[in-house]
A protein has these predicted regions:
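Short, conserved interaction/coordination micro-motifs, predominantly
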Residues: 1-11
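DNA replication initiation modules
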Residues: 7-9, 18-22, 32-46, 65-82, ...
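Short Gly/Ser/Thr- and Asp/Glu-enriched loop/turn motifs at secondary-structure junctions
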Residues: 12, 67-69, 102-108
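Residue-level detector of short, conserved catalytic/binding motifs and their immediate flanks
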Residues: 13-15, 72, 98, 109, ...
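ATP-grasp fold ATP-binding core
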Residues: 16-19, 100-102
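Short linear proline/tyrosine/threonine-rich motifs used for host-factor recruitment
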Residues: 27-29
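A short, charged, amphipathic alpha-helix used as a generic interaction element across diverse proteins
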Residues: 52-55
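Active-site-adjacent substructure of cysteine-protease-like catalytic cores
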Residues: 78-109
Length: 198
């Protein structure tokens, strides 16, 4: 499977393995370093090049990369049914127009792109919006582990998504806005995105 992985991803230097483990009663993917311990997302020394991780592939359930620096990733969970993408997933794939692959579960997708000079406002936008099953990782000083399968949809390369990412964030990742206005000592007025309430 991984021999079909894009060369530009193979040239990336921050790979790790991952294994399924049960934590708090839930099955989760745990990143693993070739140094025989769990990979720490904040320590890029725990990651390695593609050829090295492939040399250890027998230890793991799969491989992944650290999203750090100018790398970006969009995860959409549970968006494939009967081999078709959901409307939201189709929209995002079309707009972002970058490398896209099917996740290990076979029911989700991941898009990999790059951003330059992008500021991810975590106070304004979710990183993980469970309402849509959507996660966005970009402009991170510390790594965020994501799985890589090589099971690509189409033949797109990893492209710069700096200009299109804000549109995705505005539509799907905005946190609720609630501004409290202090009008006097007796009454507080609340202004929300839907109107003014007393």
């Amino acid at each position: 499977m991984y021999e079909k992985l894009l060369q530009e991803l193979k040239d990336y230097t921050y790979f790790c393995g991952w294994k399924y483990e049960t934590r708090n009663g839930s099955r989760t993917k745990v990143p693993k370093s070739v140094k025989d311990h769990n990979a720490d997302n904040s320590n890029l020394d725990d990651f390695c090049g593609f050829s090295e991780i492939i040399g250890h592939i027998g230890k793991y359930d799969g491989i992944g990369i650290a999203i750090t620096g100018d790398m970006a990733a969009i995860d959409i969970d549970h968006c494939i049914e009967d081999g078709k993408l959901s409307d939201m997933a189709e929209e995002i794939v079309s707009k972002v127009n970058t490398y896209t692959e099917i996740s290990p579960s076979g029911t989700g997708i991941r898009l990999i792109g790059k951003t330059h000079g992008f500021n991810y406002d975590k106070e304004k936008y979710y990183i993980n919006n469970r309402k849509y099953g959507l996660e966005v990782y970009a402009a991170r000083d510390k790594g965020q582990f994501v799985t890589i399968t090589g099971n690509a949809i189409g033949d797109k390369h990893v492209r710069d998504i700096t200009d299109v990412l804000p549109e995705i964030l505005e539509k799907y990742m905005c946190r609720p806005v609630l501004v409290k206005l202090f009008c006097n000592t007796l009454f507080d007025k609340y202004l929300t995105v839907t109107g003014l309430h007393r």
